[in-house]
Amino acid sequence: MDYRFGRQYRLLKTDDFSSVFAFRNRRSRDLLQVSRSNGNGLDHPRIGLVVGKKTAKRANERNYMKRVIRDWFRLNKNRLPPQDFVVRVRRKFDRATAKQARAELAQLMFGNPATGCRKQA
């Protein structure tokens, strides 16, 4: 198993983010929202992260949230389909609620309709 998180697993360019947002395939929970593409033409998934200053004013808080999401992706990327994902943090979470954020991320990424995720058009 490969647990690295190299550049090939990241969405880096504005066009990559725009193409994912153009599909308008979004699901959200209390803390997170995940947008996904139909496919990326590669043999592995890629992820992009959006954590705005409205969510958390301090950079160390935003970095912590991104680190939690990246770590979850790094450990689970082999189980995900070859799609592009953009994860947007809707509400701030910290060490106390990081477990809830990981659980929500799993529900949103694996796309189980029985999880009660809200689908947005």
UniProtKB/Swiss-Prot annotation:
Matches recorded under PROSITE patterns: RIBONUCLEASE_P
Keywords carried by this UniProt record: Endonuclease, Hydrolase, Nuclease, RNA-binding, tRNA processing
Catalytic EC class: hydrolase
E.C. numbers: 3.1.26.5
Domain of life the protein comes from: Bacteria
GO molecular function terms listed in the Swiss-Prot or TrEMBL record: 3'-tRNA processing endoribonuclease activity; ribonuclease P activity; tRNA binding
One cellular component term from this protein's GO annotations in UniProt: ribonuclease P complex
Catalytic activity, reaction form: Endonucleolytic cleavage of RNA, removing 5'-extranucleotides from tRNA precursor
Subunit structure: Consists of a catalytic RNA component (M1 or rnpB) and a protein subunit.
Protein name listed in UniProt: Ribonuclease P protein component
Native source organism of the sequence: Neisseria meningitidis serogroup A / serotype 4A (strain DSM 15465 / Z2491)
Lineage per the UniProt record: Bacteria, Pseudomonadati, Pseudomonadota, Betaproteobacteria, Neisseriales
Name of the gene this protein is made from: rnpA
